[in-house]
Amino acid sequence: MLLAFDTCLDKTYAGLADKDKILDTVIVENEGNTYHSAFLISCIRDLLKKNNLTPKDITTLVTDVGPGSFTGIRACMTVAKVMAQQLNLKTIGISSLEIISNVTKTKKEPLVLLDARKNKAYAWEKEILGALPIESLKEKVMTGNYSLITDDSMYALFCSLSDDIVSYTRLEHDFAKIMIEISRQKETDNWQNLKPLYIQPPPVFGR
């Protein structure tokens, strides 16, 4: 049994799959001043209960490793590592960039751009390209070779350079389903090897 979850982006997503069958998924949004990632534990608990399962039925965890909000990445990584360690589960980490690259069918090669701040964007073209300068990415976009999938801030920067562009936040999507589909093409790993991909490094206190 596979459990997938993501709190790194616009909502919390969780899903269950048994072999090739997706059993159930759930999407949780912010509630008032409470960020959606705060509901991850209860979301997983309710999802398992609804499907007459317990944590001991899970064999594999799939989690988003970022980039995204610091709070969301931390929630995903903490829950994934604790569950995997306590239940002896295999894990699969998938980047937000790869997830978003599958959110819609594109006419051309998808180029995913997420705001990395400091005049940079996290870029994906078949693989993670890293945080690249906005100006160099503008040159890449202007070749006309790509279908752009972005967040809202990158959409505002690049929409004047391409007609083939969409912000993923404006699309109907279920990232849990996408993660489950992607995971079928990946090898499982040990939880110790899950590495977060932060937009900015987390603060180091005491310096």
Name these PLM-found stretches.
Residues 60-91:
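DPxDG-like acidic metal-binding loop motif
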Residues 37-41, 76, 80, 176-180:
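A general structural signal for well-ordered alpha-helical segments in protein cores
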Residues 44, 80, 97:
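Generic structural marker for isolated residues within well-ordered, non-membrane alpha-helices
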Residues 44-60, 140-145:
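Phosphate/pyrophosphate-binding loops at sites that engage ATP/ADP/AMP, CoA/4′-phosphopantetheine
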Residues 1-22, 35, 92-207:
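Oxyanion-binding and handling regions
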Residues 31-49:
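N-terminal phosphate-binding loop and adjacent alpha-helix
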